[in-house]
Amino acid sequence: MWDYKHFLLLSLAFTSTVTALSKVLGDTDQVRMTSEGSDCRCKCIMRPLSKEACSRVKGGNMRVEDYYTVETVSSGSDCKCSCTAPPSSLNPCENEWKMEKMKKQAPELFKLQSMVDLLEGTLYSMDLMKVHSYINKVVSQMNTLEETIKTNLTRENDFMKESVVNLSNQMKKYENYSEIMLSIKKEISNLGYQLLQKDAPENKAQDTAGVKGLAKFPNNKKNEGDKSLSKVTKDKPPKAEKPKKEVSKTKQVPPQPTPRPRSPVLQPVVIRGVTYYKAGRQEDAENAAGNRESVVKGPHRGAKQEIRTEGNITEPYLIREERIVATQRATPTPTPTTTPTTTQSTTTTTTTRTTISTATEYPLTTLSSTVLGAEAETNKVREGECEGTIASVEQPKKQHSYGRNEGAWMKDPIAKDGRIYVTNYYYGNNLVEFRNLDNFKQGRWSNLYKVPYNWIGTGHVVFQGAFYYNRAFTKNIIKYDLKQRFVAAWTLLHDVVYEDTTPWKWRGHSDIDFAVDESGLWVIYPSVDYDYSQQEVIVISKLDPNDLSIKKETTWKTGLKRNSYGNCFIICGILYAVDVYNQKEGMISYAYDTHTDTEADPKLPFINEYAFTTQIDYNPKEKVLYAWDNGHQLTYKVNFVA
């Protein structure tokens, strides 16, 4: 092999030398053609001398046909062509004349040329069978190496498949563990609420009527004014410390206390907050679990008194704070009161009741509380406001031009104010809040939320003070509390068909889309129809806004195929889909009614004003559609069937 390498190197060196020599002697390209003009077609025709003609010319016997020519053929209105060829390519005699000149002028170069000829003959006279055998050996080695690599890759693929299966199993276990942790957290919170509610039976057993701080400040006693503020309570009146005598017929009964008389003093009453707790059935019987508590704070010694108001609250735990203006009330002078006392004997039982009271007027104090309603109404806007089927969608009205081509803007239909929330682009972690539409048009944002996990798509909604979105590149949906700024709920959609590849191009609509209508919160996502066509169809499901749970009885598989529509929205429990998003003249071409489980083709015109609509959401409070079209924010008024 060493000889072959050196031989090849020497041959390459000599070849390059000869090439350089030919350039020195003026041997250039055979034919060179140049053309000029805008409309030009050129053709060169070369007629060289033959070897016989060359020998005749050299011998002096030249004929008429012994000549060489280079003809130029051109065509076109604006054309200029020229063809040139070196004499060596047209006249073979030139090569012989060059050799003779080289012998005379440079004998060393002639020797070099002869050496090159010798090397070329040696190269072609070698045993090519040996080279062929070496090549076969190399090919067999390459085949063996390829088979070995395939075997190793197969093993590695099997190992990777097993690893992926193990990881998926671990993920399923982790999901189960996360559900268990959520249930444990709920149980712990329930236990905490029960511990808070346990004070009511204990206070009842101790006969303190929920008065806090009475042991520390014995002079602050509950008077008739306090009892008027808590008329609906079922707890017994508190016992004071000073005893008094009582008359009995058959035996002596322990005396009942009478509060000390006090002079009227003006005291401000400030209701700091109202807290609602969930009531159990047994605790309802004890009149303690469903109470609303208010703390009354007086100016003297900071004594706190607890007012318990009976109520039947069966909803989930609702904790609300309420502000109230402080009022002045006169502390009444307590009057002696003899509480009912029962005397017993062997034959008769006599009950003596003596009550002396003085009417005292107090200023009216109003507690303005707002209760969200029963559990069945937590996911509803207002059932009575549902208009029914769409008759038409009016022309869009442009509100503002803001942000990038893709995005979403929305309002909370439950909120009383007109705050606007914007997500610019279809991937990110920022939610921008504007106080109203005027501030949005001026670009004056009032709040900026950075969610802990990135959102993707434009199918987000804001509902009941929370931001609902799809976590990027996952099947998870998240509820982000805007007031507390933390993730309040997290759920995995098991049957969703999700493309986990990086979608750096807008595909027409979001994979997971939220919607809000008169009945509450919905989620729209693609799933595989394993029962019939094995195709990917759109599924709509009612969501519990508290924990994002999904029930089978409120989940419907529609006949709408994935990637066959532009955008969709839900009104009054009916899913509507627009056929295109990137054409101005669109149409609502599909509707699915969850009440009757039927589908139809409404064929209602829908205008994509700027031919790139990335979001359409319905606002049940305003009865309009919010849309983001190529960086423009639009609203559509919806007309319903009368």
Curated annotation (Swiss-Prot):
Quaternary structure and interacting proteins, as annotated: Homodimer.
InterPro entries in the cross-refs: Olfac-like_dom (IPR003112), Olfactomedin-like_domain (IPR050605)
Top-level taxon of origin: Eukaryota
Signal sequence annotation: 1-20
Protein name as catalogued: Olfactomedin-like protein 2A
Key words, A-Z: Coiled coil, Disulfide bond, Secreted, Signal
Keyword flag Disulfide bond: yes
Subcellular location: Secreted
Annotated source species: Xenopus tropicalis
Domain Olfactomedin-like: start-end pairs: 385-642
Pfam families per UniProt: OLF
Region (Disordered): 211-265, 285-304, 330-353
Keyword hit for Secreted: yes
Basic and acidic residues compositional bias, start-end: 221-249
Disulfide pairings: 386-572
Cellular component terms (Gene Ontology): extracellular region
